[in-house]
């Protein structure tokens, strides 16, 4: 796992022209909540090998946990840690399901480049940018990320992919409870 002081990813998604005041009080997990999220990630996705720590946090602090490929899962799993510090505005009819907190995950091929140098290249960085943008969407829109609303980027995420939209769903390859 990455060292908390090691800013493995110095790619910033934030506009440098924003006032410093906006960055002074991001919503963050308590230490206990962070341990619970990390425990959940490790139980359902695997051991966290590294963490890309966010350098500037305007509203929530979103780190990206990296779970490497294994024999059982021949792909990287990237999971946000921090999105759930903000309670989403969930529709009343769904309140009983306690969906106001969530994290996001994405699976990437086993040969995906996830070293610091490759993060300077949008061809490798775009999945991390996507996770960070989606993690902040409930704050920007004062709503929640529901199941299966397509979000169209209107352009390819990067020059090396034709992917241009995302559809949030529950993880399909985890054991029972992994979606909790």
Place the predicted regions along the sequence by residue.
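Short linear motifs embedded in intrinsically disordered, proline/glycine-rich low-complexity segments
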Residues: 1-180
């Amino acid at each position: 796992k990455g060292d908390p002081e090691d800013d493995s990813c110095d790619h910033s998604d934030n506009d440098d022209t924003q006032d410093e005041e906006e960055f002074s009080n991001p919503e963050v997990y308590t230490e206990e909540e962070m341990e619970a999220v990390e425990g959940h990630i490790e139980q359902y996705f695997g051991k966290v090998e590294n963490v890309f720590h966010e350098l500037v946090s305007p509203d929530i602090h979103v780190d990206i946990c990296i779970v490497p490929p294994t024999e059982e899962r021949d792909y990287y799993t990237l999971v946000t840690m921090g999105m759930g510090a903000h309670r989403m505005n969930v529709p009343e009819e769904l309140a009983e399901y306690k969906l106001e907190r969530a994290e996001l995950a994405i699976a990437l091929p086993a040969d995906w480049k996830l070293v610091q140098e490759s993060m300077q290249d949008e061809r490798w960085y775009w999945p991390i940018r996507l996770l960070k943008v989606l993690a902040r969407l409930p704050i920007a829109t004062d709503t929640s990320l529901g199941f299966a609303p397509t979000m169209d980027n209107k352009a390819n995420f990067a020059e090396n992919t034709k992917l241009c939209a995302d559809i949030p769903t529950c993880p399909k390859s985890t054991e029972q409870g992994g979606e909790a």
